[in-house]
Curated annotation (Swiss-Prot):
Pfam families (alphabetical): OSCP
Organism: Corynebacterium diphtheriae (strain ATCC 700971 / NCTC 13129 / Biotype gravis)
Family under the similarity heading: Belongs to the ATPase delta chain family.
HAMAP family: ATP_synth_delta_bact
PROSITE patterns reported for this sequence: ATPASE_DELTA
GO molecular function: proton-transporting ATP synthase activity, rotational mechanism
Superkingdom of this protein's organism: Bacteria
Subunit composition and interactions: F-type ATPases have 2 components, F(1) - the catalytic core - and F(0) - the membrane proton channel. F(1) has five subunits: alpha(3), beta(3), gamma(1), delta(1), epsilon(1). F(0) has three main subunits: a(1), b(2) and c(10-14). The alpha and beta chains form an alternating ring which encloses part of the gamma chain. F(1) is attached to F(0) by a central stalk formed by the gamma and epsilon chains, while a peripheral stalk is formed by the delta and b chains.
Lineage, broadest ranks: Bacteria, Bacillati, Actinomycetota, Actinomycetes, Mycobacteriales
Protein name according to UniProt: ATP synthase subunit delta
């Protein structure tokens, strides 16, 4: 996103968080409903280029853009969702595409807030990461989900069958909205959502690859050690790669710590060459 759009999104996100907080006992339901409706609105905008351009037209006044959004969506979405749309339309976005992307981000955040209200945010974070790893290891399924020639509804139906009864409702809703509405690809988008869930908990993510599965005690000890190193709370996203032979490879942001046996052997070979 360009600077103007980032600033607009930050302001609307703050307004969304405040509105959900003020909903109090209805916050969970309001957040879930708002998230779902924002994705519905994005579907409408994706299918109507003229409308998508008009609601983010910087040549129009803020009130004109807000009035257009109200005229189109009033009575079709809840008052809470309409308020998010009107607030978004009043902002100046760099281009219509980034306005649309901003609504996607807001919808995702609303669903994550609903998980937070249910005490499920950590579980959703883990489920999203696990799903991204499953898709990474199932290239045939991922190819089907990434196929632009296949109808989005059919792809969502396919993924829904895979997820049915295995994840929380929020995880399923977030995963399904990624399909057919990708900003990059399904694996990267779902992994990014898991990191966003971690960030809402005040955690940074350490991606850990080990030769064997780490148990809960080992994960906790590793998280504590990394927290001392980096000075912030950490979420451990771990996966297994037997080819490492032993040890760990840890990635935090752009920094990589390679303590694997295979890595040590490779460095030894390089030194002997």
């Amino acid at each position: 996103m360009h600077a103007a759009s980032r600033e607009a999104l930050a302001r609307v996100t703050s307004d969304l968080d405040k509105a959900l907080w003020e909903a109090k006992e209805n916050a969970i339901a309001t957040a879930a409903h708002t998230g779902a409706e924002l994705f519905d609105v994005v579907e409408v905008l994706d299918g109507d280029r003229a409308l998508r351009v008009a609601v983010a037209d910087s040549a129009k006044s803020a009130e004109d853009r807000a009035g257009l959004v109200s005229a189109v969506f009033a009575g079709k979405v809840s008052p809470a969702t309409l308020e998010v749309l009107v607030t978004s339309a009043r902002e100046l976005w760099s281009n219509p595409r980034e306005f649309r992307d901003g609504l996607v981000t807001l919808g995702r955040r609303a669903l994550l807030r609903s998980a937070e209200g249910q005490g499920q945010l950590g579980q959703v974070e883990d489920e999203l990461f696990r799903l991204s790893r499953i898709l990474d290891k199932e290239p045939e399924l991922t190819l089907l989900l990434d196929d632009r020639s296949t109808d989005g509804a059919k792809k969502r139906e396919l993924l829904a069958k895979v997820l049915y009864g295995k994840v929380t409702a929020v995880t399923e809703a977030l995963a399904l909205q990624v399909i057919g509405r990708r900003e990059s690809n399904a694996i990267d988008d779902i992994d990014a959502l898991s990191k966003e869930a971690a960030a809402l908990q005040g955690h940074s993510v350490a991606h850990v690859v080990s030769a064997g599965r780490l148990n809960d005690e080992q994960n906790q000890a590793l998280a504590q050690k990394l927290e001392r190193i980096y000075g912030r709370a950490m979420s451990i996203h771990s996966e297994v790669d037997p080819s490492l032979l032993g040890g760990l490879v840890i990635r935090v942001g752009d920094e990589v710590i390679d303590g694997s046996t295979s890595g040590k052997l490779e460095r030894l070979r390089a030194n002997l060459a």
